[in-house]
């Protein structure tokens, strides 16, 4: 882990070294690098603070929207995204005829939002100060201060929406422990944690008209009949898990992205911190921006729209998870098939149907394909610094499909759950394309 953190520090240091070069030009490569470094810094904080996947999506979306709404003015005529979303007041506008550095403004907007949503604020200070100090060296005092004030105003306007999105009201709710009845979710081994974010469907969506707009069909009815659809799907998970190929194991590990994993060694327990599923796809958005050599406005738009897809997809998925509250494979298999069976991956603490990975990855893939192209090949290095793995994909859709099936390989989802999750996620992505992108 130390070596990985060192690698990340070197990357950020190199990016910071480029900030001072031609900062007035928003389409300068250094401007894109600043945005990428900002997102990467946020990912590291989210990992350190161990935010849940739904909460992480909320942090990413407000920060990324703030960044975009500030930097979009570098390209005259670029339209607002928040104007097309639910719950936002009009964004502040720059003064006509005044000089701004919009990359600096975007950075200030980004971290104005972030600082109100994470715990480890102190860890941001060194990074932010390094960025701001380099801009101070490049800009006259008036332009610097004007840019910072504009970015701060945008960030605060974005936060105004965050204060009324349902998040605060959802805190302090009683624990969700499931139901002690056949077919219903119960806390799972090894740590039997209570259900995570069971009120997430009360969050105010950005594009969806309601949390249930993309509601999937009801899951197969629970049954102990060996000929039933439910039992056959549970047995399939068991059979696959007992006969995993090395490639299937690699795929399962690669897409695990489970921030809840707790390792056990004798009487000792310790958390194995990982990137979240949403963080993985924000990393893919960064790879696409860098590989495509887009300007900073397009890069910021990619981050913003990807985060919108993740945020709404989590709301849609969690709405169904706690409505149907389907039992996890490990519970069923241990009770009905093999009491000693252990899934290849540790089961995350929330109901089974539908698969969160399948839903959010399908939504993100739809949006990224709309921005960068359907047959966009890329080497995914998002997890390289964290688990030492990378994979090549021919399209965003291919990556999403692999992420989806990985949950069956991992022994934590039934096939129907990943299939229906992908369908719902694609619907979320298509709605974003219809209402925001086109």
Question: Where are the model-predicted features located?
Answer:
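Bacterial N-terminal signal peptides that target proteins for export
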Residues: 1-10
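C-terminal motif of bacterial Sec signal peptides marking the signal peptidase cleavage site
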Residues: 17-20
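Acidic/polar surface patches and capping/hinge elements
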Residues: 22-438
């Amino acid at each position: 882990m130390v070596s990985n953190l060192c690698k990340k520090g070197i990357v950020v240091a190199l990016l910071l070294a480029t900030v001072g070069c031609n900062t007035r030009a928003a389409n300068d490569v250094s401007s894109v690098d600043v945005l990428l470094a900002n997102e990467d810094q946020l990912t590291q904080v989210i990992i350190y603070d161990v935010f849940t996947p739904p909460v992480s999506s909320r942090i990413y979306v407000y920060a990324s929207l703030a960044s975009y709404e500030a930097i979009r003015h570098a390209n005259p005529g670029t339209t607002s995204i928040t104007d097309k979303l639910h719950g936002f007041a009009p964004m502040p506008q720059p003064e006509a005829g005044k000089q701004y550095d919009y990359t600096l403004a975007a950075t200030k907007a980004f971290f104005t939002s972030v600082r109100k949503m994470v715990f480890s604020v102190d860890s941001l200070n060194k990074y932010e100060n390094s960025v701001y100090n380099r801009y101070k060296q490049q800009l006259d005092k008036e332009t610097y201060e004007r840019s910072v004030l504009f970015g701060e105003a945008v960030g605060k306007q974005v936060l105004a929406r965050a204060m009324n999105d349902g998040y605060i009201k959802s805190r302090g709710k009683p624990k969700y422990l499931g139901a002690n009845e056949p077919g219903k979710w119960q806390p799972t081994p090894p740590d039997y944690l209570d259900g995570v974010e069971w009120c997430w469907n009360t969050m105010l969506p950005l594009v969806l008209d309601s949390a249930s707009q993309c509601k999937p069909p009801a899951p197969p009815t629970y049954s102990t009949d060996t000929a039933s659809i439910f039992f056959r799907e549970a047995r399939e998970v068991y059979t696959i898990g007992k006969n995993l190929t090395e490639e299937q194991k690699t795929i399962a590990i690669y897409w695990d992205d489970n921030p809840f994993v707790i390792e056990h060694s004798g009487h000792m327990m310790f958390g194995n911190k990982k990137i979240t599923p949403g963080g993985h796809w924000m990393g893919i958005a960064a790879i696409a921006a860098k590989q495509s050599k887009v300007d900073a406005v397009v890069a910021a738009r990619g981050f913003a729209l990807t985060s919108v897809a993740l945020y709404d997809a989590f709301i849609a998925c969690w709405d169904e998870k706690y409505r149907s509250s389907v039992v996890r494979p490990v519970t069923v298999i241990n009770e009905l098939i093999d009491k000693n069976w252990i899934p290849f991956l540790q089961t995350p603490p929330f109901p089974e149907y539908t698969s969160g990975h399948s839903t959010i990855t399908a939504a993100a893939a739809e949006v990224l394909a709309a921005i960068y192209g359907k047959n966009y090949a890329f080497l995914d290095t998002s997890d390289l610094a964290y688990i030492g793995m990378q994979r090549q994909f021919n399209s965003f859709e291919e990556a999403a499909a692999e992420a989806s099936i990985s949950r069956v390989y991992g022994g934590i989802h039934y096939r129907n759950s990943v299939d229906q999750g992908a369908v719902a996620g694609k619907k979320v992505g298509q709605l974003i394309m219809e209402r925001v992108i086109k």
